[in-house]
Amino acid sequence: TEVTATGERVPELTAFDELMTRFVREQGVPGASLAIAHRGKLLYARGFGLADRDTGAPVRPTTRFRIASVSKPFTAVAILKLVEQGKVGIDDPVLPLLGRPAKDPRWARITIRHCLQHRGGWDRAISGDPIGQMGEIFRTTAIPPPYDPAQIVRYMLGRPLDFEPGARMAYSNLGYLVLGRVIAKVAGVDYEDFVRTAVLKPLGLNSLKLGKAAWKDRETDEARYHTRDNRTGLSLYDPFGPPVPYPYGAENFEGFEAHGGWIATASDLVRFADAFHDSAKCPLLKPETIALLQARPDGNAGHEADGQPKAAYYGAGWMVRPIKHGQVNLWHSGLIAGSEALLVKRWDGWSWAVLFNSNGAATGGNLSGAIDPLLHRALGR
């Protein structure tokens, strides 16, 4: 089938057109959006394939997608902004800011830095990820889902940690929900409002907002999300209604918030990444704060078993790969039912964002992992 492209063709970057049309076709993905920037200039913004398989509407450069965990860099920059303003310290404990006691005494030792670097003490491989544990939360609280982030954090305050805070790295969505509560408490406004004021407004990023779960509540310029297996489930948002496509209410999507709840255009994502191409001129954070964002974590979070530094590690809200002369590649990927996202800032001033309205690669694995090396290769630098 023919994969149509929308947006302006850029003669110097046609390698990306070829890559995207082939990738969308071969992977059997409905649609995708790619934006590329270089040192402060948005050079490329195109849509490929279909935003909605049912209506045949194409993806446009202005189409918004759920960005899943690419939300984390925005949450991280927001909290670092509060650190920069002196409102909170990066090594401050989070518990006093949550305003409730915790069952496990080790909670008192969890810091903001731990949450940023996924070192808080929660390991979803051991105790599961609370963002999907609707049944357990219901049995414990007797409150039916959906759950907002504050309810999920409150539930987890009553659960034991999986390891001593700071001891190691285990990817944790909960840690970012905790950071969302910290932002609201310290800033005195709700999480979304603070991110908008502190992170989005200075860059003129108007497409970003927290998305909605139900089909009827979607934005008019938002892609329609398709899962590979077209699975359905009962809606948490309308439990007595008919089964819904999985992305439209079968997950607790409106509770994802600070760890994975935003929607955006690829162009706005790449403008955000591009703001970090030169630490000295970043409109969001000072160079010393960016150094915190990129810092290698202590212990095995940043080092191999033999003590050697890892080639790549999770910093504050971004994966970090040191390249040379203090220059780094930063990136984050995201995956939820019906969408995937990848945002990359390279050390040499190039950045890109790619968004899909489906999840999972035809070959197994995920779309962001499959396309990442192809994008670096297409740039040919």
Provide a role label for each language-model segment.
Residues 90-105, 201-203:
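Short, glycine/proline-biased beta-turn/loop segments that scaffold the active-site neighborhood
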